[in-house]
Amino acid sequence: MITDEEIRKVIAPLLLSGAKMLDKHCPKCGSPLFEKDGRVFCPVCEYREKKKREEMKGVEEVLMEKFKDLAFSLPKDVNELMQHLDAMEKLLTIIERYRKLEGRG
């Protein structure tokens, strides 16, 4: 189902830009398909995918920031250092998994 936000942010600007709304619908979300510059596409699915990628990128940025914080505050005590390194290793594993989900890993 198409939300009001998607109509405002995606469909209305497309119509104003000269894109043609077709009489066919997206099999995935039910939105009308559009044609612009010879390309037929579902603007709602593209918008949702872009939004999802941005959210995933935000998560990765938070994890990388935490990784940097740990890297710049390594303790001198060996036991504490091992805990820091374990946490850093786990963060790297999670970051790698996010990248795979995005198709970048």
Swiss-Prot record:
Transmembrane segments: none annotated. Pfam families: Auto_anti-p27 (PF06677). GO terms for biological process: DNA-templated transcription. It comes from the Archaea. Belongs to the UPF0148 family. This is UPF0148 protein PYRAB12700.
